[in-house]
């Protein structure tokens, strides 16, 4: 179940025509997997954005939408009390959703939507286990429009004058940081979980050539420091009183020099709005 609020450009306006009726907003959703004792019934808070892919008729369009946010209320893995949960290891997980649907404008106030979507819950390897939870499903709902006028239902057929796009170069700079757990290979060829978390940080710097209102492309300089890169283990006896069932007892995890944990490279970028 979802409850959302969104906003968009005025129907028939120049930005609305250029960007295909794009809209964005914030939403809240509730999930039940039929196993509250092991997985919980999480609640997600998220941002969403969507737009028209194609117009089928004056009142019917084929749209896409994606969501991104956080979900809480999970029952994470516990070696003693919830050992059957091999999917999630944290109480808070990232929420990602993408889907396509038909939008039918019924009246000035109401739209009917029907389609399908894919959802992924994960903590991004910040805790183990992190198999995640994936779902696919059908969606059906009603959209209430607060400020839409009767005339707005036909404005989508009007194409206002769009001036020629001034091509130019822009620059994107992204800084990021996080942490992660690591599975390390041992002599038997199996992986065991390291006992701690490792920092991750990096940047992307990309000059982008803006070709038109919707498309830009360029080359990005990417740098990353991954504290878990090339971590290895030796079969040595160390003082672990209890390993929590992780299999780390009796092993020392070794971190190589920083020169083995840095990476720098180039990548191609393309963005279609």
Identify the residue ranges that each predicted region occupies.
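Outer-membrane beta-barrel translocator/channel fold
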Residues: 1, 12-18, 38-39, 56-96, ...
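Residues that define the transmembrane beta-barrel architecture of outer-membrane proteins
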Residues: 1, 20, 39-45, 90-96, ...
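Transmembrane beta-barrel strands of outer-membrane/channel proteins
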Residues: 1, 28-30, 64-72, 114-120, ...
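Residues on the lipid-exposed face of transmembrane beta-strands in outer-membrane beta-barrel proteins
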Residues: 3-7, 47-53, 66-70, 96-104, ...
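Repeated loop/turn-to-beta-strand initiation elements of outer-membrane beta-barrel proteins
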Residues: 12-15, 104-112, 148-152, 213-217, ...
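Outer-envelope beta-barrel architecture signal
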Residues: 18-24, 58-64, 108-112, 134-138, ...
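Extracellular loop and loop/strand-boundary signature of outer-membrane beta-barrel proteins
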Residues: 33-36, 82-88, 123-130, 188-193, ...
């Amino acid at each position: 179940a979802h409850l959302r609020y969104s906003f968009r450009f005025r129907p028939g306006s120049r930005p609305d025509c250029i960007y295909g009726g794009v809209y964005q907003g914030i939403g809240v959703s509730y999930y039940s997997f039929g196993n509250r004792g092991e997985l919980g019934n999480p609640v997600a808070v998220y941002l969403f954005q969507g737009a028209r892919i194609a117009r089928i008729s004056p009142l019917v369009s084929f749209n896409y939408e994606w969501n991104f946010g956080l979900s809480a209320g999970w029952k994470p893995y516990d070696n003693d009390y919830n050992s059957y949960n091999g999917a999630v290891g944290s109480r808070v997980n990232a929420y990602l959703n993408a889907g396509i649907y038909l939008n039918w404008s019924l009246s000035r106030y109401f739209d009917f939507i029907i389609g399908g979507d894919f959802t992924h819950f994960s903590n991004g390897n910040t805790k183990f286990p992190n198999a995640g939870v994936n779902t696919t499903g059908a969606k059906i709902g009603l959209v209430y429009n607060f400020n839409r006028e009767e005339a707005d239902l036909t404005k989508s057929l009007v194409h206002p004058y769009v001036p020629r796009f001034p091509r130019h170069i822009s620059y994107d700079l992204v800084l990021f940081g996080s942490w992660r757990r690591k599975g390390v290979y041992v002599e038997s060829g199996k992986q065991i979980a390291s006992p701690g978390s490792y920092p991750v940080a990096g940047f992307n710097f990309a000059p982008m050539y803006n070709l038109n209102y919707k498309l830009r492309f360029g080359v990005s300089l990417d740098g990353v420091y991954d504290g878990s890169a090339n971590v290895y283990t030796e079969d040595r006896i160390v003082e672990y009183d209890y390993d929590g069932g992780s299999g780390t007892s009796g092993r020392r995890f070794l971190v190589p020099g920083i020169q083995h944990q840095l990476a720098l490279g180039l990548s191609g970028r393309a963005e279609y709005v």
